[in-house]
């Protein structure tokens, strides 16, 4: 009996991981901002934050996720209500497929929240 394999296609390859963090901030938290030559995403686990990326300002709530593309200036500030908890992961990826995430606001579900929690646990 002959076995036939299935060839897999690679669409997104992470070359390096720079940081994996879970932050529990105060309700008056403010980060003045930065830019760097790698991707980063921020996901709100609790509370609410205002994020500037380039010239765009967005309010993120629980379950919201955005990507910062390489060299994009970005900052984050708590909105003053519920103290925010954030997942922040930064990484190198040179694949064109990543540009799908430019300027998008995504919402994650409970399954995806659990996957992020497992990544945080593994990174400790």
State what each model feature region is:
Residues 1-59, 65, 72, 116:
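Generic protein-terminus/edge-of-domain signal
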Residues 16, 82, 111-115:
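Alpha-helical structural motif
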Residues 24, 90-92, 109:
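Residues at the C-termini of beta-strands that transition into short coil/loop
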Residues 29-36, 77-79, 104-105:
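Short histidine-centered beta-strand/loop micro-motifs
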Residues 44, 90-91, 119-124:
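Short, intrinsically disordered, charge-balanced linker/junction segments flanking boundaries
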Residues 60-61, 83-85, 105-106:
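Glycine-rich, phosphate-binding/catalytic loops in enzymes
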Residues 71-99:
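Ligand-binding loop in jelly-roll beta-barrel domains
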Residues 98-124:
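Amphipathic alpha-helical segments enriched in hydrophobic/aromatic residues interleaved with Lys/Arg
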């Amino acid at each position: 009996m002959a076995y036939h394999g299935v060839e897999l296609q690679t669409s997104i390859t992470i070359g390096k991981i720079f940081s994996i963090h879970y932050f529990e901030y105060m309700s008056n938290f403010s980060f003045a901002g930065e830019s760097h030559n790698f991707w980063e995403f921020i996901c709100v686990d609790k509370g609410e934050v205002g994020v500037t990326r380039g010239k765009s300002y967005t309010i993120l709530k629980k379950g919201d996720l955005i990507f910062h593309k390489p060299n994009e200036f970005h900052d984050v500030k708590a909105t003053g209500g519920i103290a925010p908890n954030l997942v922040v992961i930064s990484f190198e990826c040179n694949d064109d497929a990543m540009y799908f995430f430019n300027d998008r606001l995504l919402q994650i579900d409970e399954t995806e929240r659990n996957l992020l929690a497992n990544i945080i646990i593994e990174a400790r």
